[in-house]
């Protein structure tokens, strides 16, 4: 399924680059969740015994900053998805993340409107737009 933004009867229009960046950030959701968990479980490599190393100054702080940024993005996507009514969430999520067609339980335009709003809300909350 092609990635395009609805143009007619859509008050949630984004610039093309912003739209695609937001869609790909949403598609990266599962990897971000896995990375947030792995940052908690990872440990630095053992020291090599030399007095001066080539590593960064504070690896724990840099991992903490990285994890906070990932969690901020995850929360922004979750909050944007909550703006979609519960009965349409699965269809909208499947359309954006898994590129599935919309379910047949509601009209395609209804799902399209909610998908547009979801992507717009995610772009605003992620700070992309």
Language-model regions, residue ranges each:
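DNA major-groove recognition helices of helix-turn-helix
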Residues: 107, 111-129
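A short pre-motif secondary-structure segment
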Residues: 91-92
């Amino acid at each position: 399924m092609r990635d395009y933004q609805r143009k007619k009867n859509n008050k949630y229009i984004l610039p093309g680059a912003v739209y695609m960046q937001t869609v790909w950030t949403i598609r990266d959701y599962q990897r971000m969740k896995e990375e947030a968990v792995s940052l908690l479980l990872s440990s630095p490599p053992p020291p090599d015994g030399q007095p001066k190393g080539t590593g960064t100054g504070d690896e724990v702080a840099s991992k903490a900053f990285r994890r906070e940024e990932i969690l901020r993005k995850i929360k922004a996507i979750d909050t944007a998805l909550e703006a979609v009514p519960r009965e349409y969430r699965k269809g909208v999520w499947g359309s954006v993340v898994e590129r599935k067609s919309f379910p047949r339980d509601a009209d395609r335009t209804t799902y399209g409107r909610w998908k547009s709003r979801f992507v717009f809300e995610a772009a605003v909350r992620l700070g992309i737009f």
